[in-house]
Amino acid sequence: MRMLKKGSKGPDVKTLQRKLGISADGVFGPMTEKAVERFQLDKNLPVSGIVDNDMWALILNLDYAVPEEIDEDTDVKAQYFTTKYDQIIHRHYLPKGEYVEGPVNNEYIFLHHTAGNANPYRCIDHWGRDDRGRIATEFVLGGVNHRNENDEYNGVMVQAFPEGAQGFHLGKTGSGYMNRHSVGLEICSMGYLDENMKTYVGSVCAESQIIQLDEAFKGKLFWHAYSEEQIKATEKWLRYVGERDGVDIRLGLKQFIQKYGPTKGFDFIDDAYYGKVKGLLAHGNVRHGKSDCYPHPDLVDMILSL
């Protein structure tokens, strides 16, 4: 069996979780790590939170455990939920004070990408440590590492603060009301690439992670590709959040694409900037200088199918 640690996912993780008697979602998150540490303490093993060969030898000799109710500090049920669209959403909340507690009624949904690496937990942790105030989106979607193609977090959806709370994620627009009544998703992606397939920080993108658009967007042809899993997860999320918050996801971006085509549809739109378009929008619809999200053909097709 392979070594497992926080961020691992797959059938081996489900086997581990069943053996430990916790809910088996197949993702090695914070609560699985705590269960591993507890097992290591019980067996007088070094407490690392990592499942190596020695620990596997002990684990595989266990009978499958019935999922147990455990104390509030380690209750795995509090760490994720499953939507009616069969999407698991993991909870990894920012510290209080790093988001607006609300309650807030959302009337807009925004798609962003992080211009960062693939780990959604690390993105949220970074927000919690920075000094920019309450800047965050409610949700972050993991992706594929652009350098080494590691897919541990690919398609993993994480919630950064409770439903009804708010983070600032748009910057300066023509509508303060829109800024305060919008829910956002950050898709983990490095964004645009230069002609040498390098990111804005100078790292080289693996060939499998590159997409070339038919038409340049914001002056860029090459981009870190959104993965198939990310696009599928985004669709499930849009349907869930649109229903949760009463936002019609067919309005806004879908209409822009139908009217102007994908390149212009993802670009700046005056009415969107002033908050006049309630529905689904891209960050670039309301900010001239933003390139998130870009019109990946599969993302465009998904939005048109809504």
Briefly describe each language-model feature range.
Residues 1-7, 22-24, 45-46, 171-172, ...:
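Second-shell loop/turn segments in exported
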Residues 9, 115-116, 286-287:
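Short polar catalytic/cofactor-binding loops
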Residues 42-48, 64-68, 287-292:
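Secretory-pathway/luminal and periplasmic proteins that interact with or process carbohydrate-rich
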